[in-house]
């Protein structure tokens, strides 16, 4: 897991997300507390439970982006789910237990990649030997068995040197590789995904591991052989246990759109996709044991981060038991014009940088001036105020409209320099922004 300090985590998030310092600090502290807990003795470690977080804020202010970036920083099993995809147990739809199953699958993949990387050097050696065995077959005795030579022959050493220097990369060889498993696609109704995956793995394992001769260039064969040899060096049982430990001790679940499962007013009949889902989430967040195809997983120390816009519902509309299990509340602020200006310029891969790079592929040099950036930000904020406030996503809409003409004619503008200043922006957007009916449908 990540050993970054809260300050370092916030600094990394600052490269991609503008503002929302309180939310960044909360997730940074929560992530660091995962590391701190692992430094305690076993008895005390078991007693320290994660403090789950509820992020509240209008759409388009960075809630989901914080989750995306956190996933890359955490170096721990992480999954992001939409609360609206689930229904109460016993009804058509996904059960909330599938969150932990998917998290465990993600952990197995992550641990497998780490194990393969750890064994990569040994796998490269074994792959090299297999290619050399094809180029220079080892000597055999009278009974057709391969003789174990004490010292590699001079010819083998010469070929090894050429292989490492890349002189043989384009030479074709025929080599035996593991055949792809039997492809079986099973369609199942919603909620039966676990049974489907078990049936698929059963069919794929039928017939054992078969070898298939393939003709490949040496550089391509080397890549496939390294993967094959690395996979052989990994112990599947150890891998599963390591993955389950990683989920139980370091797992993070991000539940988006949790406000959409709040109960709205008085309704008759079962509320299977709202309050029913909240009730099913309770044992997961509180701590229970979930059965997965890799083994039993305890959820006592998994960190849950929930987020929602809460424009119609309020956090108090969640059932009280779930509110109590999300003790840390973070409110994200609506974005201002100055925030929009910073979003257009400060992130490592800001929207303006992306558009400049896209147009550069056609030989068109785009330059955004400070006045142009300011006018784009003002236009986006103005449309948000007069219609629906969709936060930073409005910048994509405004910029796409602004760049439409250049994008269409880019192939004819090769070699030209185009400056986008306040006048350029006003000329193309002012009429749309001023007309509320037009901006409602176009911007």
Curated annotation (Swiss-Prot):
Binding, ATP: 18, 60-65, 256, 321, 393
GO biological process, alphabetically ordered: protein unfolding; proteolysis involved in protein catabolic process
Entry-linked Pfam families: AAA (PF00004), AAA_2 (PF07724)
Keyword line: ATP-binding, Chaperone, Cytoplasm, Nucleotide-binding, Stress response
Keyword Chaperone tagged: yes
Source domain of life: Bacteria
Localization per Swiss-Prot or TrEMBL: Cytoplasm
CC annotations in GO: HslUV protease complex
InterPro entries: AAA+_ATPase, ATP-dep_Clp_protease_ClpX, ATPase_AAA_core, Clp_ATPase_C, HslU, P-loop_NTPase
Induction: By heat shock.
Gene Ontology MF: a single term: proteasome-activating activity
Record family assignment: Belongs to the ClpX chaperone family. HslU subfamily.
Known role: ATPase subunit of a proteasome-like degradation complex; this subunit has chaperone activity. The binding of ATP and its subsequent hydrolysis by HslU are essential for unfolding of protein substrates subsequently hydrolyzed by HslV. HslU recognizes the N-terminal part of its protein substrates and unfolds these before they are guided to HslV for hydrolysis.
Subunit comment: A double ring-shaped homohexamer of HslV is capped on each side by a ring-shaped HslU homohexamer. The assembly of the HslU/HslV complex is dependent on binding of ATP.
PANTHER family attached to this UniProt entry: ATP-DEPENDENT CLP PROTEASE ATP-BINDING SUBUNIT CLPX-LIKE, MITOCHONDRIAL-RELATED (PTHR48102), ATP-DEPENDENT PROTEASE ATPASE SUBUNIT HSLU (PTHR48102:SF3)
Name of the protein described by the UniProt record: ATP-dependent protease ATPase subunit HslU
Organism lineage: Bacteria, Pseudomonadati, Pseudomonadota, Gammaproteobacteria, Enterobacterales
Primary gene name: hslU
């Amino acid at each position: 897991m990540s050993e970054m300090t809260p300050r370092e985590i916030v600094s990394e998030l600052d490269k991609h997300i503008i503002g929302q310092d309180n939310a960044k600090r909360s997730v940074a502290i929560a992530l660091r507390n995962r590391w701190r807990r692992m430094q305690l003795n076993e008895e005390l470690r078991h007693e320290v439970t994660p403090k789950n977080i509820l992020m509240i804020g209008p759409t388009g202010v960075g809630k989901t982006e914080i989750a995306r970036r956190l996933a890359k920083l955490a170096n721990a099993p992480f999954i992001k789910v939409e609360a609206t995809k689930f229904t109460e147990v016993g009804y058509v739809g996904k059960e909330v237990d599938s969150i932990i199953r998917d998290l465990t699958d993600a952990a197995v993949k992550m641990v497998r990649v780490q194990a393969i990387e750890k064994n990569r050097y040994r796998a490269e050696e074994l792959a090299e030997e297999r290619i050399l065995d094809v180029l220079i077959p080892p000597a055999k005795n009278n009974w057709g068995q391969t003789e174990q030579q004490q010292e590699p022959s001079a010819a083998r050493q010469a070929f090894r040197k050429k292989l490492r220097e890349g002189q043989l990369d384009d030479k074709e060889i025929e080599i035996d590789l593991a055949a792809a498993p039997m492809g079986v696609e099973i369609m199942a109704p919603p909620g039966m995904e676990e049974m489907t995956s078990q049936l698929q793995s059963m069919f794929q394992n039928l017939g054992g591991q078969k070898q298939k001769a393939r003709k490949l260039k040496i550089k391509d064969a080397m890549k496939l052989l390294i993967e094959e040899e690395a996979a052989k060096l990994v112990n599947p049982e150890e891998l599963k246990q390591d993955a389950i430990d990683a989920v139980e001790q370091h797992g993070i679940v991000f539940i988006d759109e949790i406000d959409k499962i709040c109960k709205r007013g008085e309704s008759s009949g079962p509320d299977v996709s709202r309050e029913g889902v909240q009730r099913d989430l309770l044992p997961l967040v509180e701590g229970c044991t979930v059965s997965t195809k890799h083994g039993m997983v305890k959820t006592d120390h998994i960190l849950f981060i929930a987020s929602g816009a809460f424009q119609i519902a309020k956090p108090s509309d969640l059932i009280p038991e779930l509110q109590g299990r999300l003790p840390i509340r973070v409110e994200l602020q609506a974005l201002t014009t100055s925030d929009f200006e910073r979003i257009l310029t400060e992130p490592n891969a800001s929207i303006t940088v992306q558009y400049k790079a896209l147009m550069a592929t056609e030989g068109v040099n785009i330059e955004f001036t400070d006045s142009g950036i300011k006018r784009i930000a003002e236009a986006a904020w103005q449309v948000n105020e007069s219609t629906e406030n969709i936060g930073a996503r409005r910048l994509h809409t405004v910029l796409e409209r602004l760049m439409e003409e250049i994008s269409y004619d880019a192939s004819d503008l090769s070699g030209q320099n185009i400056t986008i200043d306040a006048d350029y922006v006003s000329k193309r957007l002012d009429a749309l922004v001023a007309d509320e009916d037009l901006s409602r449908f176009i911007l």
